[in-house]
């Protein structure tokens, strides 16, 4: 028997100086961090399972963050909710496989697969059905799901996927190797002696990774630690693997928020000049010259915010949805809700949908917001759709019919004060950004 009345340690990551990830206090950070959490209704038996994979740019986060508490979702949906930890940053996403047979890559993704294997083998003891496991995640968690759908080792471990605000993202092998060698250089270790990493304290590796991130990105949204195409673990870029049938038969619910980029580029913050911001986006997105695209956006901080929203998040979600259309049913959503009383949540920014999906409205109260009836209704609508998907592989409900996404009508469920289906929202902008999506 194991005492499981407290959350396990959190994987090493940059400190939470603002207290936004863990507002209740500083968690324990440890390399022994591969724990998961289970919430189940009393008397649960053969209930569908929802496994949450947290985001955080592959650098931060944990399944134990209060925002991801699964109690409300489990009770309202009669489901079993699981949240998982996985190794982050240089500990989870350093592409070391090219250095020899003793080294691995994508171990953060392999941690997620281990959690899914544990869930399949043990969740019946908590009242869950191992034959109905839906993975859902946001940002880097959603990008992780894109990778899982492409990984041979994950096949058979999940029966449905919900991707929130995170498209397919993976380095080419040479990009991942350059980052790995850059970290070794920061630590004064040459390629032939990479095994010395095992002799270093985690804090030293974290500090070197922080210096490398700053040097390579200049503080931009670019992610230097992320999944890498690797012959043993992730043999093909996820969107291409899915287009080739790697996720055949798996229902997919995918979507974005209307103003994702306004989370990263904010009014009043120190934002580079528009030319520098475009360079930052080109680096972060791996796209060619964006100057022509930028001419369609405001020539201030809102321009880069809009491009990041439309090209990376929205365009990426559409591209991934299209890759799965021939192989399984797909549903598309967009979260538009904003709260006038909050300067950041005034718009539907990145992460804004999470408390509504989990039903954790206390998170919004902690931000000083009064919970209005429309907010409660929005949360119920989103929870009911996610729960219906977990139970039966379709998000539509009697109160909220939701047609499948297809190339002809591109039906998209818009979550706002009232939820409604819109056919092909903003088609001109969709065609514009797709010129930049390979």
Which residues make up each language-model segment?
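Catalytic nucleophile serine of serine hydrolases
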Residues: 137-140, 152, 165
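Alpha/beta-hydrolase fold nucleophile elbow
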Residues: 126-138
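Active-site loop->helix "elbow" adjoining a glycine-rich segment at hydrolase catalytic centers
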Residues: 55, 107-111, 139-142
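Short glycine-enriched nucleophile-adjacent loop
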Residues: 142-154
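Alpha/beta-hydrolase active-site loop
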Residues: 33, 102-124, 175, 182
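Substrate-access "cap/lid" subdomains that shape
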Residues: 121, 155, 160, 164-280, ...
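Alpha/beta-hydrolase-fold serine-hydrolase catalytic core, especially in secreted/extracellular enzymes
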Residues: 232-234, 250, 300, 315, ...
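Non-catalytic accessory segments of hydrolases
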Residues: 1-106, 221, 364-382, 390-400, ...
């Amino acid at each position: 028997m194991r005492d499981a009345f407290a959350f396990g340690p959190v994987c090493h990551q940059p400190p939470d100086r603002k207290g936004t990830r863990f507002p209740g206090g500083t968690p324990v950070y440890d390399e022994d961090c591969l724990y998961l959490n289970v919430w189940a209704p009393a008397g649960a038996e053969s209930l569908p399972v929802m496994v949450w994979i947290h985001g955080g740019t592959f650098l931060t986060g944990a399944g134990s963050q209060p925002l991801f508490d699964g109690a409300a979702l489990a009770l309202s949906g009669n489901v079993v909710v699981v949240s998982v930890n996985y190794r982050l940053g240089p500990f989870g996403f350093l592409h070391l496989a090219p250095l020899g047979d003793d080294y691995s890559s994508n171990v953060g993704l392999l941690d997620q697969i281990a959690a899914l294997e544990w869930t399949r083998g043990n969740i019946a003891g908590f009242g869950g059905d191992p034959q109905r496991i839906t993975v859902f995640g946001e940002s880097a968690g959603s990008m992780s799901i894109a990778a899982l759908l492409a990984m041979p080792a994950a096949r058979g471990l999940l029966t449905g996927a919900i991707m929130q605000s995170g498209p397919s993202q993976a380095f080419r092998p040479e990009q991942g190797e350059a980052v790995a060698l850059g970290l070794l250089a920061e630590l004064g270790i040459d390629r032939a002696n990479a095994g010395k990493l095992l002799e270093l304290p985690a804090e030293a590796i974290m500090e070197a990774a922080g210096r490398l991130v700053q040097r390579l990105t200049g503080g931009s949204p670019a992610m230097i630690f992320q999944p890498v195409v690797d012959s043993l673990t992730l043999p093909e870029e996820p969107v291409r693997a899915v287009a080739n049938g790697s996720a055949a038969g798996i229902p997919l619910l995918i979507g974005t928020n209307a103003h994702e980029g306004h989370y990263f580029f904010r009014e009043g913050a120190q934002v580079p000049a528009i030319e520098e911001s475009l360079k930052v986006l080109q680096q972060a997105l791996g796209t060619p010259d964006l100057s022509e695209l930028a001419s369609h956006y405001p020539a201030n901080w809102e321009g880069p915010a809009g491009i990041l929203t439309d090209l990376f998040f929205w365009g990426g979600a559409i591209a991934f949805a299209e890759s799965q259309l021939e192989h399984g049913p797909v549903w598309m959503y967009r979260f538009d809700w904003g709260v006038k009383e909050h300067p950041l949540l005034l718009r539907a920014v990145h992460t804004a949908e999470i408390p509504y999906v989990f039903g954790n409205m206390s998170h919004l109260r902690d931000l000083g917001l009064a919970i209005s009836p429309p907010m409660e209704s929005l949360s119920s609508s989103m929870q009911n759709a996610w729960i219906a998907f977990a139970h039966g592989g379709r998000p539509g409900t009697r109160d909220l019919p939701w047609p499948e996404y297809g190339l002809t009508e591109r039906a998209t469920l818009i979550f706002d004060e009232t939820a409604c289906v819109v056919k092909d929202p903003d088609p001109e902008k969709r065609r514009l950004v797709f010129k930049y999506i390979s």
